[in-house]
Amino acid sequence: MAGHSKWANIKHKKAAQDAKRGKIFTRLIKEITVAARLGGGDPGSNPRLRLAMDKAFGHNMPKDNVERAIKRGCGELEGVNYEEIRYEGYGVSGAAVMVDCMTDNRTRTVADVRHAFTKHGGNLGTDGSVSYLFTHCGQLLFAPDIDEARLLEVALNAGAEDVIDNDDGSLEVITSPDTFVAVRDELEKAAFKAELAEVTWKPENEILLQGDDAAKMQKLLDALEDIDDVQDVYTTAVLDI
């Protein structure tokens, strides 16, 4: 169950992200700005900022855009003061959904998030209602047909917590948030390039949705992703579409 459709779901996620590249830039600029505001403008001493910058450059964001976002976060340039908020709720068949936002207007954001849940058969819950169902961790996903033994050796020596062999043949490396960058860098030095590499909230248990239920859940997730203030959406649902 843990590995069901993992590879297909990741490919779908990547395709959806590529289709929304303009929005990704906006989200990354927000993340860089907030990371710099909270932890300073030096990526060497601010892991959150380094991750955001790595992701931005991975999406070919111009260096000038990144530097301006850092300066806004550090107060060197004027900019919007974003607030981080998390909303929790339920989708189809009780699948848990967690929505991380950055906003300059909390009232607008909660209204938009609640509307998306209500319109697509879900409901917005209270703080803490589903967050306990997820673990904060680093996640790196590798395509099937790679050297599993070598990857396992490099990952564990670099400080990875686990390597999961999914049913579809893909390999998943799990790290703590703090060791994610070190593990990723060591794997890249050994020529292992992840198809997906991120610090995320991984569900403890997944719920498989198929047919109409999967289609309905996809509409809810898409509606949440389309909200301007939404940064990330996490769910316990695995969609078999």
Curated annotation (Swiss-Prot):
Pfam families assigned to the protein according to its UniProt record, in alphabetical order: TACO1_YebC_N (PF20772), Transcrip_reg (PF01709)
SUPFAM superfamilies assigned: YebC-like
One BP annotation, GO: regulation of DNA-templated transcription
Family annotation (InterPro entries): Integrase-like_N, TACO1_YebC-like_2nd/3rd_dom, TACO1_YebC_N, Transcrip_reg_TACO1-like, Transcrip_reg_TACO1-like_dom3, YebC-like
UniProt subcellular location: Cytoplasm
Alphabetical keyword list: Cytoplasm, DNA-binding, Transcription, Transcription regulation
First-listed, main subcellular location of the protein, grouped into a coarse class: cytoplasm
Gene Ontology MF terms in the entry: DNA binding
GO cellular component: cytosol
Tree of life domain: Bacteria
Transmembrane helix recorded as keyword: no
Keyword Transcription regulation (UniProt): yes
Assigned protein family: Belongs to the TACO1 family.
NCBIfam families: PRK00110.1, PRK12378.1, YebC/PmpR family DNA-binding transcriptional regulator
Protein name per its UniProtKB record: Probable transcriptional regulatory protein Neut_0281
Lineage: Bacteria, Pseudomonadati, Pseudomonadota, Betaproteobacteria, Nitrosomonadales
